Amino acid sequence: VTAAIFITLAAHAAAPNTNAASNAQANGPSLITSAAGVRLRESPDAGSAEVGRLQLGLVVEELERSAAKARVGSTEAFWHRVSAPGGARGWVFGGLVAPFDPARRDEIYVRLASERVAHAAATFPELTELVRFLERATKEVRRRDALAELELTRLVALGRSLASFSIEEQEKPPYKPWVTEHEPEIVYSEPAGQWYVRADLYWNFEKKYRGLPVAERAAWQGAQTPLPGECEGYLPCHLYVQKISNGQYLKLYPRGAHSDAALANISELLGHVTEDMRGANPVFDVPRADRAEFRKTVAEMRAQLALVPARKKARVLGQLDAISRRFR
């Protein structure tokens, strides 16, 4: 992560713009930065000199506030002169900070994490800074549900950070150090040329927080996380992958928010298999030596669907029956 991401300590306090009226705040309220790499400026003007940068989720003390709002881009807000940990002082635009109340720390952290991870166009620096914030935040919250939300968001943000750079960039900074730092939590897929968060971390999370709404989301995340390697035409491998992903989700959450999508994923694969079986040169195969184990996997998949409503699972069960007959 580049040094610019983290707070740069100013060598001296940035003086307020003497031409801009401001409201002095003695023992002013606390604010929290709501974006990555927030610029700390010498005066309340977007064109003034930059004296430092503040990382996402940093709590600062407000010293002054501009008398009038200003417009930066499409946002209209006050400017705030702040004091940051380490002694840096300067002006930040109000669109990049939010009120912070220590008594509402859990709620504020969860909301900030949710807002930032929802930013679909987030860059690698923004995602790594989000991960850093969440690593700090999980040590500060008290409620179990808040901790769970932050832990899951951290895994999701980590996964997105790994997907934000190409195979050609993997050995270059800042990507290589990031991968090395998180190697215990990630796995590399040679065929895809990409790093993924280990799927078992999501399943372990689901078990740890089962009973909380966040556990269902973790199970779905685990089901959709790619696994390293590839199955090619080896059908037992394809079914095993479905069993430990979408099938496992349906076993745990047969009526869950993503149950229809999980069934559709399984059915899509099985549909390709049944269509392939009707061709002259089928790609999918089950060697005779592996058919006993294959039938066991099919039976386990059927069992995973036991509590799924009958009308919803009928298509998948029919596809499994057809495949079972083909590879007796």
Where do the PLM segments sit?
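Bacterial N-terminal signal peptides
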Residues: 1-10
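Boundary at the C-terminal end of the N-terminal hydrophobic targeting segment
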Residues: 9-16, 20, 26
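Boundary regions of SH3-family modules and the immediately adjacent low-complexity/disordered segments
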Residues: 23-24, 73-136, 174-184, 188-197, ...
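Beta-loop motif signature
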Residues: 23-28, 32-76, 113-120, 132, ...
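Short solvent-exposed coil/turn linkers within tandem alpha-helical repeat scaffolds
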Residues: 47-48, 135-149, 165, 189-196, ...
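TPR/TPR-like alpha-solenoid repeats
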Residues: 99, 133, 137-140, 144, ...
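Short coil/linker segments at helix-helix boundaries
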Residues: 163-200, 204, 224-244, 272-304
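Flexible, glycine-rich surface segments
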Residues: 216-272
